[in-house]
């Protein structure tokens, strides 16, 4: 209802991630909004400069990206992406409102691919996956390490891939490969993995497909969770991995271990921390913003 747009102080666009559809919406908003109202997009992938390309100067300075993380009710992080053309006073007002009224942890990001959260998050996921292949870590072992011990959902890395969709993650990687400069270390962990390509081609795209790195099968009439062998591509009954920490897992003790679990954890953390430092000042001028994200 564009009559409501005419009265609103802040309009948030959250339509499908297609630039043609978004531009069409912005054209309609531009003819109905009141001057000085704030307009923002909830995009997680499209650069601000592209989104605002057809806007008037007045609308452009009041337009930004407000990237809410899902589920919005429970995830505190909010990335506000700005450009040089933005009205800084308006951005600060929006940040204050989202902090005080919406209870969000607001981070101001530069207009770069993936912003902060997804740029580092996807890199970390790719590191965890590629290191598992390289170090011959099973997917159950990888998920036990790159899961709760590192503040990741209990799905772990491979379970998270299945949840998101292996094919969707492949599209995300293609987007990063296209947008990021060739010297960016992201490219080192974004190369095509034959097993992943085969899973997608055969319909094993994750939970929404026939299965993925994990799948449900039946044995003697009972459902059995199976895990894929990264070397052979064959499935076997999933094994429960005990890291030997009990209820409380100390990440410092984990990375100091001399076994394969400790080496795997240390390898991931080292690469992710180095990459995060590499991104300053490209994604943000403040190290604390990366820590907060």
What are these regions (language model features)?
Residues 1-293:
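N-terminal glycine-rich phosphate-binding loop for ADP-containing cofactors
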